[in-house]
Regions:
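Short, basic alpha-helical/linker "hinge" immediately adjacent to a nucleic-acid-recognition surface
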Residues: 1-77
Length: 77
């Protein structure tokens, strides 16, 4: 299996922002799922585990990883 092309490494500030947003419950369902994907990817979860835990698709996980790496947190959400 090839190495991951898009590795999510959140800064402490980004992680705190995502935790605050997900904890407050003030995000749309779509943004909540994106935030959860980023948090789990940052914790080195495998894509298959993220997919199972969040009931999402591989393409969604890959797309969110790519958006974060190429455009940052705002672009990924």
């Amino acid at each position: 299996m090839p190495a991951k092309k898009y590795i999510v490494t959140l800064t402490n500030e980004e992680r705190q922002e995502l935790l605050a947003l997900t904890g407050a419950g003030k995000l749309s369902a779509r943004k909540m799922k994106r935030a959860q994907i980023l948090l789990k990817a940052d914790e080195n979860w495998k894509d298959k585990d993220i997919i199972a835990a969040l009931n999402t698709s591989r393409s969604t996980v890959e797309r969110i990883r790519k958006r974060y790496v190429e455009g940052g947190l705002d672009k990924a959400l």
